[in-house]
Amino acid sequence: LLPYLPVTRTVLPNGLTVLVREDHGAPVVAIVTWVNAGYFDEPDSDVGISHVLEHMYFKGTPTRGVGEIARDTKASGGYLNAHTIYDHTAYETVLPSSGFLRGLEIQADAYANSLIDADELARELEVIIQEAKRKLDSPPAVALESLFALLHDQHRYRRWRIGDEEGLRLLTRDRMLRFYRNYYRPRNTILVVAGDVDTGEAIGHVTRLYGSLPDEPVERDVGPSEDTLPGFRYRELAGDITQTQVAMAWRTPGPDHPDTPALDLAAGLLTDGRGSRLYRGVRERELASQV
């Protein structure tokens, strides 16, 4: 078993939550900026904006030009990554621990000072629009997105997650900045440092780089709740594909509901791994190529 390594939690006066896990097993450190803003926080007029902002986050600040953040990180032996999901967006830097301070400075600069340059935004939107079009050519993606749209009438689950071409082309720099400045605030952010660092020194550096950021409330748009009874719904899509996709879903309670652990367990028994009931009942009988 791996040894238990405690996590030190600190909340700065401006509301930023800092989690540090000290682990000297390898000379590597990971820095993750976790912002509580994702697809659920987008109004219908701005579908996809959190994902676009993810693409723009490391695209330049007043002191670092376009491409410089990626070059500096790579020069330090590290790499950048990011992802957007329903309730958060996360930005990751992994690099040798000798470059920890430089990596943290880059993360802090991007977090507080991302320019979202208009010309760069226009170029990046073309990349994302092509990404959205590729999803239209992916039967599993189309099946999943169509399933969510069929299952929900009002909830933001119903929308195509990264947006479509028409909506993405309407995203301006002003709208991007408004979303960025509202949600990317210390009280709405968790900064995680894990790896070959000294906990006290790490917290000290974080305090110096992030502590002066203003503590401002987030104006959160939670979106509509789902108040209709779904009943049985069915949708069939036809296309020139080699394998049929079958997707099923049920509305369930939220994560805090007492029935949720039992539902998670049931889902695992049905679908997790080759020993699952669906795998044995469907895949082993050669009724499907995968479950």
Per-region residue spans from a language model:
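N- or domain-start disorder-to-order transition segments that initiate the globular core
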Residues: 1-27
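Solvent-exposed coil/turn segments that connect beta secondary-structure elements
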Residues: 23-25, 36-38, 61-62, 96-98, ...
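Short, flexible turn/loop "capping" segments at secondary-structure junctions
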Residues: 24-25, 49, 82-86, 157-160, ...
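Acidic/histidine-enriched segments that form metal/cofactor-coordinating
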Residues: 35, 61-62, 68-179, 224-226, ...
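A structural supersecondary motif
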Residues: 247-251, 270-291
